[in-house]
Curated annotation (Swiss-Prot):
Gene from which the chain derives: murC
Subcellular location: Cytoplasm
EC number(s) given by UniProt: 6.3.2.8
InterPro entries, per the entry: Mur-like_cat_sf, Mur_ligase_C, Mur_ligase_C_dom_sf, Mur_ligase_cen, Mur_ligase_N, MurCDEF_pg_biosynth, UDP-N-AcMur_Ala_ligase_MurC
Lineage, broadest ranks: Bacteria, Pseudomonadati, Pseudomonadota, Gammaproteobacteria, Alteromonadales
UniProt xrefs under HAMAP family: MurC
Family note: Belongs to the MurCDEF family.
Gene3D superfamilies in alphabetical order: Mur ligase, C-terminal domain, Mur-like, catalytic domain, NAD(P)-binding Rossmann-like Domain
Name listed for the protein in its UniProt record: UDP-N-acetylmuramate--L-alanine ligase
Record SUPFAM superfamilies: MurCD N-terminal domain (SSF51984), MurD-like peptide ligases, catalytic domain (SSF53623), MurD-like peptide ligases, peptide-binding domain (SSF53244)
Keywords attached to this entry: ATP-binding, Cell cycle, Cell division, Cell shape, Cell wall biogenesis/degradation, Cytoplasm, Ligase, Nucleotide-binding, Peptidoglycan synthesis
Length: 489
């Protein structure tokens, strides 16, 4: 451990009462946020077990760390534990949750456990509708490069670390703050970042945008009076809220009045170059290994946080230049040689119209000569309904669109808010002819017919489409399957 990293005691030393807790159980342990907290706790020395409905890369990693993993939920699995951790995705009638309450076992929400981890640390909490995972990852990478040895909990795989969570030995904890269920109000960080604010997860906020705005202001007011709010002034709602924030504020963005400002933006392929201007400091000439203006904004947030903490410019420059990306955030899967020619496959998690638009813009800037083919999987019927016209507009911007069924995420279908309806509306708009694909088998038949030499193929969405991108890579984008089918014909 670096001599720059202040040795920090474990949770049970920071909070002596936590010594009473020996065995922690996670219901829904395979989620990225849940799995990250579980990984930190098992490395703190706690006995951990947990359940989920299916195996995943997260559950496999936790099992390797000694966590007992159950596939499926059963009341008997919680009988000998001291505390049960649940996410808001877990229904009230879950048998393990019901059993825990009957046995009078304390039940805490995921965000409450994260808040306990943050309570006696220097917390950096990253909130916002878009860009949380990338921004949190960039901050963690800068602090790591500066030998601050942070603990981090991220909603995606940090490629350089091979994990989405790590227990450091310093006082720093860098984590995503989840506004989807307003649970970020449990957190009491030292630094809060707000990347942007848009209408999403509106069921939580009773369809009231003003309530969403007020909740973000409340989140920032959880800062101590000596803390700092780092906010993106380019975002119109964030700019509107600044007069309501009663804490010290550092702004960032491309705007002329930003405290940390980007100039001279240029994207070449996957990376971006830009200049950073900060009041009273030398300009920074930077390159970040991420595409798109939106990722320059994410980088500015990390730079602002690091500058506040007096991290050396050299560490910032090196961390951004060497950044290896995050799983499913414009992740380059590979370049494939097929019967049609060379085709690049990229996988992206974005599932809100603004996120999809940013991804399309980054692809156009980085590879302007390539035709953009998107396989899109809508995520949740409610989001499709609430943002329907925005989806129609954004998805019409690609050259070729294949549409999968909606990934329900536990929701019941909503009439008029499904993939077939989206396809009809996009077709009427007249910019692109969408193709509805009912199954993976159909996709592997259709895709080789559509692809052309030089295409950039983008798999886009937050559901099971991430697994699809891997299977496409394994089948050479469906061309291997097509050859097999021809031989068997």
């Amino acid at each position: 451990m670096s001599n720059k990293a202040e040795k920090y005691s474990q949770l049970r030393t920071m909070i002596p009462e936590m010594r009473r807790v020996k065995h922690i159980y996670f219901v829904g342990i395979g989620g990225a946020g849940m799995g990250g907290i579980a990984e930190v706790l098992v490395n703190e020395g706690y006995k951990l077990s947990g359940s989920d409905i299916a195996q995943s890369a997260v559950t496999e990693r936790l099992a390797q760390l000694g966590v007992t993993i159950y596939i499926g939920h059963d009341a008997s699995q919680v009988k000998d534990v001291d505390v049960v951790v649940v996410s808001t995705a877990i229904s009230a009638d879950n048998p393990e949750l019901v059993a825990a309450k009957e046995l009078r076992i304390p039940v805490v929400r995921r965000a409450e456990m994260l808040a306990e981890l943050m309570r006696y640390r220097h917390g950096v909490a990253v909130a916002g509708t878009h860009g949380k995972t990338t921004t949190t990852s960039l901050i963690a990478s800068v602090y790591g490069q500066a030998e601050r040895d942070p603990t981090f909990v991220i909603g995606g795989l940090l490629n350089s670390a091979g994990t989405n969570a790590r227990l450091g030995h310093s006082r720093y904890l860098i984590a995503e703050a989840d506004e989807s269920d307003a649970s970020f109000l449990h957190l009491q960080p030292m630094v809060s970042v707000v990347t942007n604010i848009e209408a999403d997860h509106m069921d939580t906020y009773e369809g009231d945008l003003e309530k969403l705005k007020t909740t973000f202001v409340d989140f920032l007011h959880n800062l101590p009076f000596y803390g700092v709010a780092v906010v993106c002034i380019d975002d119109p709602i964030v700019r509107e809220l600044i007069p309501r924030i009663g804490r010290r504020i550092v702004t960032y963005g491309f705007s002329e009045d930003a405290d940390v400002r980007a100039l001279d933006f240029k994207q070449t392929g996957y990376s971006c170059e830009f200049t950073v201007r900060r009041a009273g400091m030398d300009d920074l000439q930077l390159s970040v290994n991420l595409p798109g203006e939106h990722n320059v904004l994410n980088s500015l947030a990390a730079i602002a946080v690091a500058t506040e903490d007096e991290i050396e410019d050299e560490a910032i420059i090196t961390a951004l230049a060497d950044f290896q990306g995050i799983g499913r955030r414009f992740q380059q899967i590979g370049e494939f040689t097929t019967a049609k020619g060379e085709i690049k496959l990229v996988d992206d998690y974005g599932h809100h119209p603004s996120e999809v638009a940013a991804t399309i813009k980054a692809a156009r800037l980085g590879w302007p000569e390539r035709r953009l083919v998107m396989i899109y999987q809508p995520h949740r019927y409610s989001r499709t309904r609430d943002l329907y016209e925005d989806f129609v507009e954004v998805l019409s911007q690609v050259d070729c669109l294949l549409m999968l069924d909606v990934y329900a995420a536990g929701e019941a279908p909503i009439p008029g808010a499904d993939s077939r309806a989206l396809c009809r509306s996009i077709r009427v708009r007249g910019q692109v002819e969408p193709v509805f694909v009912a199954s993976t088998e159909q996709l592997e038949t259709v895709l080789p017919e559509i692809l052309q030499d030089g295409d950039l193929l983008l798999t886009q969405g937050a559901g099971s489409i991430g697994l699809l991108s891997r299977s496409l890579a394994e089948s050479n984008l469906g061309f291997d399957s097509a050859v097999t089918d021809e031989k068997n014909a």
